[in-house]
């Protein structure tokens, strides 16, 4: 990792999100305060790690961190607030869920949610800041597992494979089967699938 200059603070939490781009499911966030006396080797951007390595680190982070917490914003909240504001809300929830209150919070990206303590946004923080890397891993493993569970409920969409992202297969299945209750209605491919279904139903009624 490149050298990162930390703020002067005792308890530093890293925060990251997973799931802003998918058409289905919650956006999931995590907040992590690492224990300097129990270092975790191999932390990195969760998207660049193998699934096997991610799962091993997931268990190690939960075991060794001073405090960790998950937050989320559901599809209904995403549709109501928009994805940016829903993500900020989910980050606030993750920080609020920590059983230790951090002195400073480092957020992956270029924007910070409103928090009770000082914070800083760190572009590419998931590859620069171990606390953010740890949060990224917790959030991704959690959300991927939720997509696998949703796949069992709706196997025809292939959620376990594409994790809800707008792949050609996912968009094709949306057109074929329509939207599930977990789909984000405000996202264009879902909205278009719903409109097409309404139009087809209206045409069918005239026949």
From Swiss-Prot:
Keywords, sorted A to Z: Cytoplasm, Endonuclease, Hydrolase, Manganese, Metal-binding, Nuclease
Reactions mediated catalytically: Endonucleolytic cleavage to 5'-phosphomonoester
PROSITE patterns reported in the protein's UniProt record: RNASE_H_2
Keyword Heme: no
Function summary: Endonuclease that specifically degrades the RNA of RNA-DNA hybrids.
HAMAP family noted in UniProt: RNase_HII_B
Descriptive protein name: Ribonuclease HII
Organism of derivation: Erwinia tasmaniensis (strain DSM 17950 / CFBP 7177 / CIP 109463 / NCPPB 4357 / Et1/99)
Lineage: Bacteria, Pseudomonadati, Pseudomonadota, Gammaproteobacteria, Enterobacterales
